[in-house]
């Protein structure tokens, strides 16, 4: 059983603030969760194969092909506004000042 003091310490570490009447409920809930975890820890899983996929479907694989291309022209085609021409020339995005 998790005590009220332990529950308050856990809440403080998690940067949570509870009213005094909620701390008891919190400690009860944490105790329940810890009991569930202890039950799971007692299960013998030595002979069970680890699950590698939730579905039995095989992933479709494709060959990786290396291509060399300069996508910057396509990227800067999407720039609009007054700075579009300059952005395409210098190959930088021009944004409004965000830091003083």
Curated annotation (Swiss-Prot):
Its EC number is 6.3.5.-. This is Aspartyl/glutamyl-tRNA(Asn/Gln) amidotransferase subunit C. GO terms for molecular function: asparaginyl-tRNA synthase (glutamine-hydrolyzing) activity; ATP binding; glutaminyl-tRNA synthase (glutamine-hydrolyzing) activity. Belongs to the GatC family. The gene is gatC. Keywords: ATP-binding, Ligase, Nucleotide-binding, Protein biosynthesis. It catalyses: L-glutamyl-tRNA(Gln) + L-glutamine + ATP + H2O = L-glutaminyl-tRNA(Gln) + L-glutamate + ADP + phosphate + H(+); L-aspartyl-tRNA(Asn) + L-glutamine + ATP + H2O = L-asparaginyl-tRNA(Asn) + L-glutamate + ADP + phosphate + 2 H(+). GO terms for biological process: regulation of translational fidelity; translation. SUPFAM superfamilies: Glu-tRNAGln amidotransferase C subunit. Allows the formation of correctly charged Asn-tRNA(Asn) or Gln-tRNA(Gln) through the transamidation of misacylated Asp-tRNA(Asn) or Glu-tRNA(Gln) in organisms which lack either or both of asparaginyl-tRNA or glutaminyl-tRNA synthetases. The reaction takes place in the presence of glutamine and ATP through an activated phospho-Asp-tRNA(Asn) or phospho-Glu-tRNA(Gln). Heterotrimer of A, B and C subunits. InterPro entries: Asp/Glu-ADT_sf_sub_c, GatC. Pfam families: GatC.
